[in-house]
């Protein structure tokens, strides 16, 4: 990424108050973009990479709705649900933060480099706890998810398998005493995109019934 990568630590006045409350809060964050939105009222929207068309649409609509109300939309810049959450926020010139599981020398996935540039152009923010040249690593992404939920007052899971990174984010939200919501689905038994969402509802998580 041809941008200046800067660093912020927990003692900085711009650091997120919400993030300071969580267990294992990162000591440092590396960032590109508008650091002033890090400590704003935020909602995280997450879900499957291999998302359904309806799931992507819901992510877009929900992000657009809350961004237009002044909330910052937080997600992970992954393809699928994350991608459309960021796009929904940008569609109303809203604030959005992308939290990566790798260093900022490269955007992952590479196909979302254009979206990352659009986030920066529109005064959004891209952050990570990993040093500049740290490559994407499967172990980094679940750990990254605590930051996504930790920045936010609420997390919304759009689509998720019963074993998934999105449910890890949801568990973090619960552990952090943050609100957690999900979408009730009539299951597509062939692809089983949303079984994790319905599992959360069975466990008592509040469903979003009107979008």
Predicted features by range, described:
Residues 3-211:
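Glycine-biased, small-residue-rich flexible motifs in mid-sequence functional cores and linkers
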């Amino acid at each position: 990424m041809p941008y200046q990568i800067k660093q912020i630590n927990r003692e900085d006045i711009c650091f997120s108050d919400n993030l300071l409350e969580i267990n294992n809060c990162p000591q440092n964050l590396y960032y590109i973009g508008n650091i002033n939105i890090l400590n704003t009222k935020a909602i995280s929207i997450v879900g499957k990479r291999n998302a359904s068309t309806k799931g992507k649409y819901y992510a877009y609509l929900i992000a657009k709705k809350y961004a237009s109300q002044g909330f910052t939309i937080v997600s992970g810049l992954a393809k699928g649900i994350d991608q459309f959450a960021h796009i929904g926020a940008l569609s109303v010139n809203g604030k959005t933060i992308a939290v990566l599981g790798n260093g900022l020398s490269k955007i992952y996935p590479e196909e979302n480099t254009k979206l990352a540039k659009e986030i920066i152009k529109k005064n959004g923010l891209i952050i990570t706890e990993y040093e500049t040249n740290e490559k994407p690593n499967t172990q980094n992404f679940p750990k990254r998810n605590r930051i996504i939920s930790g920045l936010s007052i609420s997390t919304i899971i759009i689509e998720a398998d019963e074993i998934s990174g999105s449910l890890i984010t949801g568990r973090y939200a619960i552990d952090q005493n943050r609100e957690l919501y999900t979408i009730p689905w009539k299951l597509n038994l062939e692809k089983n995109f949303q079984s994790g969402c319905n599992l959360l509802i069975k466990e008592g998580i509040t469903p979003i019934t009107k979008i």
